[in-house]
Amino acid sequence: MKRSNHTGKRTILYLIIAVVALMPALVPPAATAHETSAGSVSHHARGSRSVVSSAVLAEPAVIGSAKAEGQQEIKQPARSRIAIIVDDFGNDMRGTEEMLELPVKITVAVMPFLSTTEKDARRAHEQGFDVLVHLPMEPKQGKPEWLGPGAVLTRMSDAEVRKQVEAALDNVPFAVGINNHMGSKVTGDERVMGIVLAVCKERGLFFVDSHTNYRSVAGRMARKIGLPPVENHIFLDDVHTASHVVKQMRLVQERALNQNYCIAIGHVGIQGKETAAGIRSGIAETKDSVEFVGISELVRDEWQWNSQLTPP
């Protein structure tokens, strides 16, 4: 009897050991981080780029990709970006050289029908900078002589508005778009802005609302016809000192880091050298945390803008 009991206990012990050894095969593995981190990949409202959370530790399959079996490489998100537009080129204004010598990409907005319009546009293009037509547009207030030649006015007929816009585009080579010089009255006028935007669309261009009018209809109307609603966020030189421009550049950096990008506007002109000096100092402070790009690159990525540009 003792031998039988001893043998039975040994058999039970062997069975327990066998069950323990088989347990890893019977219990399903824990889920990986990317399967349990809901919302760890979030898309910006513009639909341009993805921000991948640090919680995503494993590489997920990409549905619909040719490399859907875990072979798709996840790119790290690009740095926040800043596009600086410098207005009022075209008349050899003070600060022109200093702006063109800045150590990052800028966008050069050139007024049409002036003494150095073509020269400034060509030089900017040759240096790899984007060019915009800085189109004079009627303001609510201000002296008419501030507008310059070729201005778009609300009293013009539809045909006259179209003629002015097309002539300005023909006068500024290499333009990828238009932004408004002054224009607080025009950008609030649906009829006139409808014509301006229609010409932009016909030519494969976009419109940058300088935001001289907080009741501007430009963005809303651009969306309606399939154009990107691009707008200025911060004026750098609303106070004409280099120290103020540096402060504004810090605001630009803050917005870019919080919102993924920022568009800012400065000017050549009476205080153009001071503005350029402030921008240069601001670049030195911010260049390690953001990327400076031309407006066309920003528009292409943020709004998936792939329209074919009309050659000069």
Language-model regions: role of each:
Residues 75-145:
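Active-site beta->alpha N-cap acidic-glycine motif
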